[in-house]
Design a protein with these regions (language model features):
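A short beta-strand motif characteristic of beta-propeller blades
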Residues: 1, 35-45, 82-96, 135-141
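Solenoidal tandem-repeat scaffolds enriched in leucines and small polar residues
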Residues: 1-31
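Repeated scaffold domains used in trafficking and secretory/extracellular systems
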Residues: 1-9, 43-55, 59, 96-106, ...
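Residue position within the beta-strands of beta-propeller blades
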Residues: 14-16, 57-60, 115
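Residue-level signature of beta-propeller blades and closely related beta-rich strand-turn architectures
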Residues: 19-20, 62, 119
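Structural motif
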Residues: 22-31, 65-75, 122-128
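Long, well-ordered mid-to-C-terminal structural blocks that present hydrophobic/aromatic surfaces
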Residues: 23-64
Length: 153
């Protein structure tokens, strides 16, 4: 219900959404849609997702008070159907697990992973870049409060 992002990987359709319409509580399901049976299977929770190769990358950012956040990262192998609860980010700065993650993108040319964090009115957001293997590379300002999209040339 209430989809936010749809991605096709290996002829499979993945839908990340809110799971409900306001004012009902959001459940943020990430679902695999079966085009033949027109059914969905929930593979986990997520507020952002991206894909590269055979992998679906998912970030799930949760909060109870809109001040303190907890973010987890996982992958889903689109060929085997296996979900790995282990974060795909190595040596990630603490801000990525305690901040409000607003962006998750993968560069289609080299697999580099970009994660954006917003601080809302407190200042510009930050973008964290990781190599395709999850190794941390750098942090840079997003140029605005809520980094929510990347364009790769």
């Amino acid at each position: 219900t209430n989809p936010q992002r749809i991605i096709e990987v290996n002829d499979r359709i993945f839908i990340q959404g809110y799971g409900a319409a306001y004012p009902d509580p959001y459940t943020y399901p990430v679902q695999l849609y079966d085009i033949r049976t027109k059914t969905t299977t929930v593979i986990g929770q997520g507020t952002h997702m991206a894909a590269y190769g055979d992998k679906l990358y998912v970030a799930y950012c949760s909060t109870a008070d809109w001040v303190n956040y907890t973010t987890t990262f996982y992958t889903y192998d689109t060929c085997t159907g296996q979900k790995s609860e282990t974060s795909f980010l190595k040596d990630a700065p603490t801000k990525l697990t305690t901040g409000n993650v607003y962006l998750l993108e993968v560069n289609p040319m080299n697999g580099d992973i970009y994660v954006g964090v917003t601080y809302y009115e407190a200042g510009e957001g930050d973008i964290y870049r990781f190599k395709a293997d999850g190794t941390f590379v750098e942090t840079f300002e997003s140029g605005g409060q809520g980094p929510n999209a990347m364009v790769f040339f």
